[in-house]
Amino acid sequence: MNRDFASSLIQLNNTFYREHAASFSDTRRAPWPGWMRTMDIALEQIDAAGNEQPLRVFDLACGNMRFENFALERLSSSVHAGRPLEFYGVDSCQDLATDEGGYARRIPNLHFQEVDVLGTLMKLNPANMPDVVFDAPLADISVCFGFMHHVPSCEYRVRVLDALARQTRPGGIIAISFWEFMNDERMVRKAARAEARAELTPPFEGYDPSQFEPGDHLIGWQNDHRAYRYCHHFDDQQITDLVTGVRALSTNGDAPVRELARFHADGHSGELNRYVILQRA
């Protein structure tokens, strides 16, 4: 996939979320089952002895803040109850993050930045990455849920995961979900309809499906025939290659992350998302 086509896919998704922020947020209310196991693993690794220090959570592509709301409730009922909490969210769509029906108003010590995440990462030189990419302190827990499937090409997915690792303190936890939607026959049909429609009415100038890589698809939205989202379906080998790619970026030869867990969760099947839990070295 060439850079221009990747940029067009990113803009396609940015436009989708700007135009459909309210309707999308309305369908994203309940916490994902996989988040509970994610937090259980994270809390096993975080030392409760430093309770006077803030516990910081960083969320890349935070959407309507429903993970922050879940994490606040989960942390408040854990051994970290009473510990100062700080939440840092980054997203390219402020309308989604501050949606009136969302959770932003409920979260204390919430710091939100509107950032074109992929546009920012595409401009950086992978050989000369800054220590941190986003304006936030190093986090105890860094997460990225429901976003990696919107990142075109393996090159940029590695950059996203690398940026997430850099935003995490040594010993901190990094959690990512990978959407495996093509294992769902309903989603297979939905993608087929959207891609057939795109052949007749291209979603943007220069649309060329031959640029797609294995696992790349277009998906529509509700009954809006003009709405498209670029999404990537992951398999386990691609996820392994992604984690390996982040390790390859290390400048001192040490692996910047180690894998703690990998599991399926969510959806009617319980296998809609593949979660990977890493620990920063």
Feature annotation, model-predicted:
Residues M1-F58, G63-V132, I173-A281:
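Class I (Rossmann-like) S-adenosyl-L-methionine-dependent methyltransferase catalytic domain
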Residues P54, L138-A139:
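Local beta-strand N-terminus motif with an aromatic residue
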